Design a protein with these regions (language model features):
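Extracytoplasmic/secretory soluble proteins
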Residues: 3, 10-513
Length: 513
């Protein structure tokens, strides 16, 4: 019995030791397993971290000044980019409009990094940026885009292409046919003075005379010339119309003949007309000074007419600016054909200093992928900066607010018009004109690289030598010879010759010659 009891004690001790050893082994094993799991977890985390791309910041360079709630608006765009899985962030760099081109040129020359560039064809065309290597080809990125090719017509892409390479993204924000071939005046004053709509140059001169004789107020009314662009509205009164004038350098008729604009009879007729306007006091004395502003002059209400369709904003806003005003826009010589001189007026290109050209184009594709994205970029935050009025109409909560205006980066597929916008503005700017006659070189793009120095010099010389004659400040008879000599010294003949050569090749490819 005693032996049996001893045996039982020994057996219990053995089992305890056995369980203890086994327990220790299990504890060690669990600990080891835990360590292995943690290691695996860390490896997975590292792999995920490597797979998640860091956001690329896209810097958009544009003229203008920052709006008050710019940070909030940008954050809304960036939040939407993140929600859409774009791995992109937008940053907007503003340069005051009056120094935009000078500052931009300096930034490009010093290699300052930015990605997207707002281009205004009336001030400096994208071809000039190509010539000085300020922008780069983006063909391979555009070809991958689903939305850019959907919302921008093929004829615009053709006009954005040089030697088979796309260099810029057109802003398809308006119909360009006859878009800048009209004038805007005060209909209220036309009624008051008993005037009919002008149709000829003589009618315009008479209109000026009647306005000046009957005007009440401290300041006399003036003509407001948008002189950095050709006076297309005036061309409609000439017998040889339609034709195209580009940059006050090139005259192109509908047969594809290219001439130095200032050497044409058409230039002479327009210059003599403006000389008469100037001598009679209808053109501002300081029109070429850096301080003169067409916009500020228009806001005074003391004007006879201003070039192009200027029915921007609503009728109510204009009534606040100029009490009693009734603006209207008309075409001279209504019998002249509807004419499309250019494919687009504004565009967005990728800077040669960009480190993220593909991502920059992806942002543009994202912008045009939905109404929501477009609204955020152009109008801001619904309920904060604008109110949806249904259809394609909206109301600005602050009438003076402007984020990234349609004319910079807009598209007809998404554009909204303020409630109360002039119907004529929508008719002129927003409705396609399939019956329009296209310029023979509509999709021709001049490549100035072979005459890059001469081309840049000629553009600068136009400002110094041609503008004063164009505006009538210097008479054609007195200024023409010296101005032409300076243009020829700048290399205009060589530039015209190269332009004609390329135009001939273009027309030959199209089967026109």
């Amino acid at each position: 019995m005693k032996k049996a009891r001893v045996f039982m004690v020994w057996l219990c001790m053995f089992l305890v030791l056995l369980v203890g050893c086994t327990g220790n082994q299990n504890t060690k094993s669990v600990s080891e397993n835990k360590t292995e799991k943690e290691e695996v977890k860390e490896e997975v985390k590292e792999e995920v971290k490597q797979d998640v791309k860091e956001d690329v910041t896209i810097t958009y360079l544009r003229p203008g000044t920052e709006v008050e709630n710019n940070g909030e608006l940008l954050q809304a765009i960036n939040d939407k980019l993140k929600a859409d899985g774009m791995n992109l962030k937008l940053e907007i760099m503003y340069i005051p409009s009056d120094v935009f081109q000078d500052k931009l040129n300096m930034m490009l020359s010093t290699g300052d990094e930015f990605d997207l560039l707002c281009i205004m064809e009336d001030q400096k065309p994208f071809t000039s940026f190509v010539a000085n290597e300020g922008i780069i080809p983006i063909t391979k990125y555009v070809e991958k885009s689903k939305n850019l090719n959907r919302v921008i017509p093929s004829y615009m892409w053709e006009s954005a292409t040089i030697n088979g390479e796309i260099y810029t993204i057109p802003a398809n924000w308006c119909e360009t046919a006859d878009q800048n071939c009209c004038i805007t005046f005060r209909r209220d004053k036309m009624k008051e003075f008993g005037l009919e709509d002008p149709q000829t140059k003589e009618d315009l001169l008479n209109m000026c005379k009647i306005f000046a004789e009957n005007w009440k107020g401290e300041n006399k009314p003036v003509v407001i010339p948008m002189y950095k662009e050709p006076f297309n509205y005036l061309f409609r009164t000439l017998d040889t119309y339609p034709f195209t004038v580009q940059k006050d350098l090139f005259f192109i008729d509908q047969q594809g003949n290219v001439k130095n604009w200032m050497e044409t009879e058409e230039f002479k007729q327009c210059a003599e007309f403006f000389r008469e306007l100037y001598e009679k006091g209808y053109v501002p004395e300081d029109v070429l000074s850096s301080g003169w502003s067409s916009w500020k002059t228009m806001l005074t209400g003391d004007f006879i007419w201003v070039d192009q369709c200027q029915l921007w904003d609503t009728e109510a806003i204009w009534e606040e600016r100029i009490p009693g005003v009734e603006l209207d826009t008309i075409y001279l010589n209504p019998k002249a054909p509807i004419f499309r001189m250019a494919s687009f007026r504004n565009d967005t290109a990728v800077s040669s200093t960009s480190k993220h050209p593909e991502e920059a184009v992806k942002f543009m594709d994202w912008l045009y992928s939905s109404q929501e994205n477009y609204d955020l970029m152009v109008y801001g935050i619904e309920g904060v900066t604008w109110k949806n009025e249904g259809g394609n109409q909206y109301t600005k909560i602050d009438p003076a607010f402007e984020f990234n205006p349609d004319w910079m980066i807009g598209n007809l597929n998404y554009i909204r018009y303020q409630k109360g916008t002039y119907e004529k503005f929508i008719d002129i700017m927003g409705k396609e004109k399939p019956e329009a006659q296209n310029a023979i070189g509509l999709n021709f793009v001049f490549d100035p690289s072979a005459v890059a120095d001469e081309y840049v010099t000629c553009q600068a010389e136009v400002v110094q030598s041609v503008y004063p004659i164009k505006l009538g400040l210097v008479s054609y008879e007195e200024g023409y010879k010296a101005a032409l000599e300076r243009m020829k010294a700048a290399g205009i003949d060589k530039v015209i010759e190269e332009y004609q050569k390329q135009m001939n090749e273009y027309l030959k490819q199209k089967g026109n010659k």
